[in-house]
UniProtKB/Swiss-Prot annotation:
It holds the Pfam family Pribosyltran. The keyword Transferase applies. It comes from Campylobacter concisus (strain 13826). The gene is apt. It catalyses: AMP + diphosphate = 5-phospho-alpha-D-ribose 1-diphosphate + adenine. This is Adenine phosphoribosyltransferase. GO terms for cellular component: cytoplasm.
């Protein structure tokens, strides 16, 4: 599977706005809206991901609410694959499976429709999100996919905040690909 070269990484990184001290002091927020608003950068990213996954024998692409929907749905459309949303509680209208995960000061949860990957066990799923930080949501999402008897073959992120070690939480569950590591 293809990995982006340094020139491509710099192009994408330069298309993402960094906002200091948002949402609180000491945080550098990676604002992907500038990448989304740049048709060359957005299409470059989706082209790269399509080239990486076109021969990966993937059956579905799942995206984590909400920015994972953007990249996941765009990639699914490009690869002509079905897209499955992984959502926050009480957002899906049909019967759901749930996975709770810990936050710094509490617990949150992700959900998926019970029939999201069809009747056949063993569907091969690519999980997409814009960013991995501490890894709690991504880990819960992989576990949720596994609850459906599908297999998360890889988790893909536009950005990995490596100092927060979120990818470390996933390594025992699935392969990980981050386009950019910051």
């Amino acid at each position: 599977m293809k990995i982006l070269d340094q020139k491509g990484k710099e192009f994408l990184l330069n298309s993402i706005r960094c906002i200091n001290d948002f949402p609180k002091p000491g945080i550098v927020f990676r604002d992907i809206t500038t990448l989304l608003n740049n048709k060359e950068a957005f299409n470059f990213l989706i082209d790269h991901l399509a080239a990486r996954y076109e021969d990966a024998n993937i059956d579905y692409i799942a995206g984590i609410e909400s920015r994972g929907f953007i990249f996941g749905a765009a990639l699914a459309a490009r690869l002509r694959l079905p897209f499955v949303p992984i959502r926050k509680p009480k957002k899906l209208p049909f019967i759901t499976l749930s996975q709770k995960y810990s936050l710094e000061y509490g617990v949150d949860e992700v959900q998926i429709h019970i029939d999201a990957f069809g009747e056949k066990a063993g569907a091969r799923v690519l999980l997409m999100d814009d960013l991995i930080a501490t890894g709690g949501t991504a880990k819960a999402s992989v576990e949720l996919i596994n609850q459906t008897n599908a297999t998360c073959v890889e988790a893909c992120f536009l950005i990995d905040l490596v100092d927060l070690k979120g990818s470390e939480k996933l390594k025992s569950l699935t392969k990980i690909y981050s386009v950019l590591e910051v």
